[in-house]
Amino acid sequence: MSRRSSRLQAKQQPQASQTDSPQEAQIIQAKKRKTAQDVKKRKEEVTKKHQYEIRNCWPPVLSGGISPCIIIETPHKEIGTSDFSRFTNYRFKNLFINPSPLPDLSWGCSQDVWLNMLKKETRYVHDKHFEVLHSELEPQMRSILLDWLLEVCEVYTLHRETFYLAQDFFDRFMLTQKDINKNMLQLIGITSLFIASKLEEIYAPKLQEFAYVTDGACSEEDILRMELAILKALKWELCPVTVISWLNLFLQVDALKDAPKVLLPQYSQEKFIQIAQLLDLCILAIDSLEFQYRILAAAALCHFTSIEVVKKASGLEWDNISECVDWMVPFVSVVKSTSPAKLKIFKKISMEDRHNIQTHTNYLAMLDEVNYVNTFRKEGQLSPVCNGGIMTPPKSTEKPPGKH
């Protein structure tokens, strides 16, 4: 037999066996079908979405506070089909609307720096309605606390940035809690200042000094426990762009000339402390939390310069700040009716840095004057912003008898 005929015979033999056993052919086909189903099932298991839920680990440090959590898988729960018809359409704010006013930087991209600052504005949230969460608290309690912190800052020659960091920590912490007792406010306030001083000051006051200024109301152990509670509640996010930082930046951008030196102050110290005094007074009012820090600083700058300067320094338009400018009118009238703020000389503080040291004046009395001016505005007796300037309210000795 030739080699070719033997190959043909071997090829025809399995074909004959297949035709002789149809049952075996059905078994092979069933196995192929089963294998295909197994592969499809495995693919579905791989692509199937997992369900998770959040479970608290520890009890909250404070009543109504937050606590650390873990995420656990819940495969037994079915994934429901989302009904998007009940949701409301929202328009998100575009961070690229306002172009960067920053000049070219030798140490980084000015556009990236600017966008990072704007992102912090949306990430570090504050809200004037936090008092709704605390039934025992009244708006003036916050004002009294912040005024006291201003005084502590001046006594220990702390920087303005330190105070505004403490103010931000306090306001954001209160948003995370519920039904805080009014007796806890001083502890929360001094602890916020304690945290801020460790972040900002080169030579921060010692822990015992912060306990000392409370006159025995808060011990060192109380401050340390509250420090941990605040840090956990804020999720260790401690780097906001404060109101005073925005003001510093705007004045610097406006003062820069052809050869900019961004890191060295180029603006007038006198102008800075005048506007800073206005912001100190404004921040005591809880309604200031209705505005972003950037808007507050730009509105204050507008009252002491012009809208053209604000556009150049901040990239904001009149529509962005008009509401805040109008809200700030009574504060401006009270500040301008008092003697202008003067640069103070502090021991061991250089002349170049003295404008950055926080000062204190009788802000609570000034805030009372603001509230009095607001009563006239509500009655239509005081116009908002006019081209000729801002009307000065009557002196306290000239108030009508029925308005006391």
UniProtKB/Swiss-Prot annotation:
- Give compartment(s): Nucleus
An MF annotation (GO) of this entry: cyclin-dependent protein serine/threonine kinase regulator activity
PTM (free text): Phosphorylation by CDK2 triggers its release from CDK2 and degradation via the ubiquitin proteasome pathway.
Q: Region (Disordered): which ranges?
A: 1-45
In terms of PROSITE patterns, this protein maps to: CYCLINS
Q: Where is the composition biased (Polar residues)?
A: 7-26
GO biological-process terms attached to the record: cell division; DNA replication initiation; G1/S transition of mitotic cell cycle; homologous chromosome pairing at meiosis; positive regulation of G1/S transition of mitotic cell cycle; regulation of protein localization; telomere maintenance
Query: Which Pfam families did the record assign?
Result: Cyclin_C, Cyclin_N
| Cell membrane listed as a keyword | no
Q: What is its main location?
A: nucleus
Carrying N6-lactoyllysine, the residues are: K348
Instruction: List keywords of the entry alphabetically.
Output: Cell cycle, Cell division, Cyclin, Nucleus, Phosphoprotein
Transcription regulation keyword on record: no
Q: Residue spans with biased composition (Basic and acidic residues)? A: 35-45
Q: Which residues carry this modification: Phosphothreonine?
A: T392
Where does the record place the modification Phosphoserine?
S21, S383
Query: Of which family is this protein a member?
Result: Belongs to the cyclin family. Cyclin E subfamily.
According to its UniProt entry, the function of this protein is described as: Essential for the control of the cell cycle at the late G1 and early S phase.
Its name, as the record gives it, is G1/S-specific cyclin-E2
- The species this protein belongs to is Bos taurus
> Mind giving the lineage of the organism this protein is from?
Eukaryota, Metazoa, Chordata, Craniata, Vertebrata
Q: Which gene is transcribed and translated to give this protein?
A: CCNE2
